[in-house]
Amino acid sequence: ILPWAEKLGYKISPFDFRVPGVTSISADTHKYGYASKGTSVILYHSKALRRYQYFTATDWPGGLYLSPTFAGSRPGALSASCWAAMISMGEKGYLESARKILETAKKIKNGIEEIDDLHILGDPLWVISFASNSIDIYRILDFMSKRKWNLNGLHKPASVHICITLRHTQPGVTEKFISDLTQAVDHVKKVPAEKG
């Protein structure tokens, strides 16, 4: 998302080879690349750095074994499907997806900020973490899980986060999330925690 957010005019701190000391960049291509799981991309700052990735086994019973990756030989179908997904999306598709995700994230962030007892941690773009100083945030997580929201609990500080994806940009999803989250807060405030 970061390169597309930058192209869309969002203020993004440098994160790539423009930063001194960055020697490689890896990206899983399934979540925001819209490819099948099982593919990733790794970029090296130079060819000299890439040579350290090669895997060699000199004691293999079949003879000398060399591979560009530790995983060895793999079917090409995953790579082909990743390539097809990226070609299909194109720059225009990725920009549009990023725009939708970032706009949805802003709406969700604003909605969370309007709920008493919750506050946003940091200044997120699309991975939004929220916490509470007055109620048990993990009970909020439990309530939201029962409503079929896929959120993650964090600690230090105790918080919950949602990673906004293209699925969240569909009509009505933002409103449903904020409604369920509001109900979760009301429930936790009214219903005492079970002992045990």
Label the predicted regions.
Residues 32-33, 38-43, 61-129, 158:
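Structural motif of enzymes handling amino- and sulfur-group chemistry
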Residues 28-30, 44-47, 85, 131-133, ...:
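Structured loops at beta-to-helix junctions and adjacent beta-edge loops in soluble globular domains
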